[in-house]
Structures are given as C-alpha cells and as structure tokens.
C-alpha cells in the first residue's frame, strides 16, 4: 500500500524471487492514490544511478532498457500488478480477495492519516490478510490503538501484526531484516 513509483514492490519481488529460487509462485501487488506514480510503477523503468544501491545478487533479474534506464526482466515484471486505491475509501473495490495476502506492507503511509483513519485503514487491510498473513508497518507507525483481530509480533525495526500466531516463514524475513 502506498507503492509510489514501485521501488518497494520491486524490492519485495527481487527478495522473493531470490529466496524462493523459482520454486513457488507469487504475486506482488502495489497500490497508490497518485495516478502518475502508478503510471511510473507500471512502466517499471528506473535510472541507472539507482542500480549501485541494489545488491549484486539481484542484478541477474535486471535488464538495461534505453538510455540510462533499467527494469526487471519480463518474467519478474509479470509478477507485479499495480492498482489505484484511496485508503480512506473502504468502498472502493480492489483486485484482491479477502484472505488472499500472506504479507501486506504499508510503510510510511499511515503517518499521513489521523488516528481514526489509521484504525479504519488497518481494519480494511486486515480483511485481505490470510489467517497466517502478516501486516508490516514502518518503524514510525506504531498503532496508537489495539485491534481485536490483530496481535503484534516481534519483527526487528518495523511493526508487525498478524491475525493468529506468527507464521514460520516470518522467521526468515526477520533474519533478513537483522
């Protein structure tokens, strides 16, 4: 949520591709309210000046495209889908089913909303979490309220919440974050 021009969604896709080594199917969704950001995310081309900040292990998934730009290779780009979402409009439909998501990342987004809107957004996002799914929020986004459907879990440097017990796969994510 709040994907801007897609860099975080691309980062998640790179990490998943590398960790899963093509052994499992995944889909990464990104949403934003700003249409130009969504257009840029969908295009998926980034300045070569950003490439040195991407660990070399992921360069195999990148290709040069045109003048001073790079993008994901087509097989990886097909794993990304971007859509428009106004987080305060719970009635706006999105291309996801309830309980579909193993992980929802909402990093540095809630800080722009009032507490009652944050509560409503978190409850909205929780509908899309699988029973063993995890909601990850930015380091500055501690919820100033409790939600009966979510419990906080220990994840270094960020705030994590789940519906039930923390899933086993989260241990690998927590180790990456250290």
Where are these regions (language model features)?
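Extended basic-aromatic, gly/pro-enriched interface segments that bind polyanionic ligands
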Residues: 1, 24-105, 109-117
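Conserved SAM-binding loop of SAM-dependent methyltransferases across substrates and taxa
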Residues: 5-22
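Short, well-ordered alpha-helices that flank and scaffold nucleotide-derived cofactor binding pockets
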Residues: 14-18, 43, 127
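Core SAM-dependent methyltransferase catalytic element
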Residues: 103, 144-178
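Short strand-turn motif at the edge of the Rossmann-like AdoMet-binding core
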Residues: 109, 138-141
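A short glycine-rich, Lys/Arg-flanked "PGG" loop and its adjoining helix->strand segment in the class I
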Residues: 119-131
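Conserved beta-strand signature within the Rossmann-like core of class I S-adenosyl-L-methionine
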Residues: 131-139
């Amino acid at each position: 949520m709040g994907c801007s021009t897609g860099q975080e969604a691309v980062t998640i896709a790179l990490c998943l591709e590398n960790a899963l080594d093509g052994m499992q199917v995944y889909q990464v969704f990104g949403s934003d309210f700003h249409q130009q950001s969504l257009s840029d995310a969908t295009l998926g081309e980034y300045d070569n000046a950003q490439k040195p900040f991407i660990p070399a292990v992921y360069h195999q998934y990148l290709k040069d495209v045109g003048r001073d730009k790079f993008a994901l290779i087509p097989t990886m780009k097909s794993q990304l889908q971007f859509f428009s979402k106004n987080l305060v409009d719970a009635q706006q439909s999105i291309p996801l089913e309830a309980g579909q998501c193993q992980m929802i990342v909402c990093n540095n987004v809630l800080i722009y909303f009032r507490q009652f809107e944050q509560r409503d957004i978190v409850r909205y996002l929780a509908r899309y979490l699988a029973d063993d799914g995890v909601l990850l929020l930015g380091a500055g986004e501690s919820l100033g309220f409790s939600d009966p459907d979510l419990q906080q879990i220990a994840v270094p440097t960020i705030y994590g919440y789940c519906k039930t017990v923390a899933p086993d796969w989260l241990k690998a994510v927590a180790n990456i974050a250290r």
